[in-house]
Amino acid sequence: MREKLAQVVEEAEKALAGASTAEVVEEVRIRYLGKKGVLTQVLRSMGSLPAAERPVVGKLANEMKVRLEQALASRSALLKQEEKAARLAAERIDVTLPGVLPHLGSMHPLTMVRTEIENIFLGLGFQIVEGPEVELEYYNFEALNFPKDHPARDMQDTFFINDEVLLRTHTSPVQVRTFEKTAPRVPVRIIAPGKVYREDDDATHSPMFNQVEGFAVDTRITLGDLKGTLVYFVREMFGERRMRFRPSFFPFTEPSAEVDISCVICGGGGCRVCSHTGWLEILGAGMIHPRVLEVSGYDAEKVSGFAFGMGIERVAMLKYGIDNIRLFFDNDLRFLNQF
């Protein structure tokens, strides 16, 4: 029995040595260790041995089984390594071939429009200044000549944090903060882009939106300078458009005006977008109120200035024909991939 066990294991080891694939190794395992395998049959025949030999032969049989199992595992591991090495060699990367570029995103339409606005005014000699979004009530209202009973100070229109702190409702506070640093020096030409917050939410309004404030101060600035600046801006942003200035009111400018351009959809002929008026409002503007200059440190008798403000979403909606402001914030790739 001992000789037979040794012979079976030697035959199995020879078969393994010649195995070149994992499939052949599995065939050897089944042939010798399977339910009907050679070694299995030998072990089952131990019952015919004399009782005195069974413990010795049983121990030897288990040792032979373990030896064969180890040989099978060793050969399988070796073949897997060789197979992996061959696969890697066949899949060698040719670094001279062009790679596959990852999908590149694009700029958000609001970022594109903001950058375009900034570049237009940078070309006119303006500088970019930013201010805090969490603002003091003084800079947001009082320093900008808002009376105590102005509707904008109502809790229904403004997000107040406490009696003196709020989320700014416009970027105009940057104007006063800048003047406090520059007064009495002139000239000053600044644009102030940033986020603002108002209690408003519908198809054309959002509780958070982006605005650009622009202002200039010098010794002899007139309404004509304001008009010339805005005419240039409209031409650069929208192309050749008719413009009109409508009298309006803002606490921090006097005189004040709303600025309209001929409809970007119908060209001024009248359509649903412009409510059949032929005009679309794009911004508010005016000459800086003397009181705003004085509280900021300027002598209103010696200097003057103009200011204007526009919503970036509003400009983008007009420029691209978008009719719902919520599209800018929905993160819908079907919309964003168009830009």
UniProtKB/Swiss-Prot annotation:
KW Aminoacyl-tRNA synthetase (keyword) present: yes
The keyword Protein biosynthesis is assigned to this record: yes
Annotated EC: 6.1.1.20
Database matches in PROSITE patterns: AA_TRNA_LIGASE_II
Name of the protein: Phenylalanine--tRNA ligase alpha subunit
Listed GO biological process terms: phenylalanyl-tRNA aminoacylation
UniProt subcellular location: Cytoplasm
Protein's organism: Desulforudis audaxviator (strain MP104C)
Keyword annotations from UniProtKB, A to Z: Aminoacyl-tRNA synthetase, ATP-binding, Cytoplasm, Ligase, Magnesium, Metal-binding, Nucleotide-binding, Protein biosynthesis
Principal location class: cytoplasm
Source organism superkingdom: Bacteria
NCBIfam families, alphabetized: pheS (TIGR00468)
GO cellular component, one term: cytoplasm
Catalytic activity, as annotated: tRNA(Phe) + L-phenylalanine + ATP = L-phenylalanyl-tRNA(Phe) + AMP + diphosphate + H(+)
GN (gene name): pheS
